[in-house]
Amino acid sequence: NKVLWFKQNQPDIFKRTWKFLCYEDFVQHRLGLDPIMSHSLAARTMALDVRKGGWSDELLGIAGVPREMLPRTAASGTVVGTVPDSVADDIGLPRGIVVSTGGHDQPAGALGAGILESGEAVYATGTVDCICPIYKTYSVTEQTVAGNLCCYPSCVPGLYASIAFNFTGGSLLKWYRDTFAAEECRSAAESGRDVYEILCDSVPAAPEKLLILPHF
């Protein structure tokens, strides 16, 4: 959608664009390497052929996005290259650093939590509350589609992941702060305290009956 927005609303920028990159491949490019996007992250663009592990010519054709405007793709953990000495010296890194592809945040978190087998899952709390299960085979059914559940490459080659999430994590706390906590924000700025510490000071010991359903 973001690429199409540029194509439809900023056609001059679109025509001058060399590559559309995500975070991992942009960092690779800035480190002087030919960028490669992990299958895990590329799937989130909705332009990856998940089963074949490469860009979908059919989807790119429908969108009118040339394949050469996207980076190469590879499995997570694929070696991209070694940071050139000149770049390493310029930014204060030791020479000889090897860079590899990464992955989408939730499957990467699952890997870090030791979720390596089909049928296992990790529960993560951050911007959102998210459950990320791992599968042995690619599976999209009427039930998963109805539940808005995706299936895409995990950060472990040969396995797949899904994500079930709700916007009740840190993003909801930020919304509350920005919407209702103007006085607390001023107090935090004056005292040097964290605004969330000030908010926590006013929280009663027992849960309240008021609930927020973040469907907005």
For each feature predicted by the language model, list its residue ranges.
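Phosphate-handling substructures
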Residues: 1
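Active-site core segments that coordinate phosphate-bearing ligands/cofactors
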Residues: 4-36, 41, 46-64, 81, ...
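A conserved helix-loop-beta module that forms one wall/lid of the active-site cleft
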Residues: 64-75
